[in-house]
């Protein structure tokens, strides 16, 4: 299910064909005799409505009407940050399993902060490269770098009095305080999106550290290594060489942290 752009309203969600791919899953469940079934999507997925026996039902009621005679059905929204992943990423998880079987709830864990997860990695500025695999900073516009150097940890450059986001003519850029924003060391990372390459997108900038001159270090987005860590992906992953930095970031932005799925499926008995 898409959670951006034209999917922001209930009406438009109901009229976007992509959001009905779920019905193909239902068709497969009808044909096959699975013991366990896992369906995953964004939390808004649970608000979708489908026709059953002439009635328009929300997803949970729809599945219950279709399959409750054969399966126990559990519907939850699990946030990755409560399951050992240093990223806030809520996901809708539907678990279906035959009535004689067991699927236990995943056990919550304490939150892991960004400081714990990536605070040990070398500081990098735009375009710099470290000796660690995948720990290479993207190159950013000088105007973006300048305003982020004067932006404290956890703050947006839109809050700056002098060094705020500007157009080439010096005019202030219009935008939200969720963009041009640094992350917070003492919290998990925010949800990683497909635009983790852009300083101007949502809360993508490294937390940084205050320097002796009053500016802040690491005026850049997270490196791939940092993104892998906060997404519970092996930071030394050998992905295909033909895949670009941008493409890998898009994959991560569309993905589910593998450790979250592991915590869910290990409850199968």
Name every feature range the model reports, one short phrase each.
Residues 1-4, 47, 201, 238-240:
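Short acidic/His/Gly/Ser-rich catalytic and metal-binding motifs that mark active-site loops
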Residues 2-179:
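Class I S-adenosyl-L-methionine
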Residues 140-269:
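C-terminal target-recognition/interaction regions appended to catalytic cores
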């Amino acid at each position: 299910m898409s959670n951006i752009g034209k999917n922001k309203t209930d009406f438009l969600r109901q009229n976007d064909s992509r959001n009905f791919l779920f019905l193909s899953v239902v068709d497969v469940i009808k044909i096959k005799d699975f013991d366990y079934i896992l369906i995953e999507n964004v939390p808004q997925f649970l608000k979708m409505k489908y026709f059953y026996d002439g009635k328009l039902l929300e997803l949970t009621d729809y599945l219950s009407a279709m399959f409750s005679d054969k399966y126990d059905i559990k519907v939850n929204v699990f946030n990755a940050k409560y399951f050992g992943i240093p990223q806030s990423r809520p996901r809708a998880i539907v678990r279906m399993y035959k009535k004689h079987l067991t699927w236990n709830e995943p056990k919550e864990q304490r939150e892991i902060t960004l400081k714990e997860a990536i605070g040990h990695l070398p500081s990098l500025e735009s375009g710099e490269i470290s000796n660690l695999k995948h720990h290479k900073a993207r190159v950013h516009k000088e105007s973006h770098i300048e305003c982020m150097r004067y932006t404290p940890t956890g703050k947006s450059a839109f809050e700056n009095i002098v060094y705020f986001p500007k157009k080439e003519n010096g005019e202030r850029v219009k935008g939200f305080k969720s963009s041009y924003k640094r992350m917070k060391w003492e919290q998990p990372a925010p949800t990683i999106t497909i635009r983790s390459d852009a300083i101007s997108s949502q809360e993508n900038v490294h937390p940084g550290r205050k320097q002796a001159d009053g500016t802040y270090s690491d005026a850049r987005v997270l490196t791939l290594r940092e993104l892998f860590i906060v997404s519970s992906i092996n930071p030394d992953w050998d992905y295909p060489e033909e895949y670009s930095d941008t493409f890998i970031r898009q994959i991560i932005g569309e993905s589910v942290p593998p450790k979250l799925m592991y915590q869910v499926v290990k409850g199968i008995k």
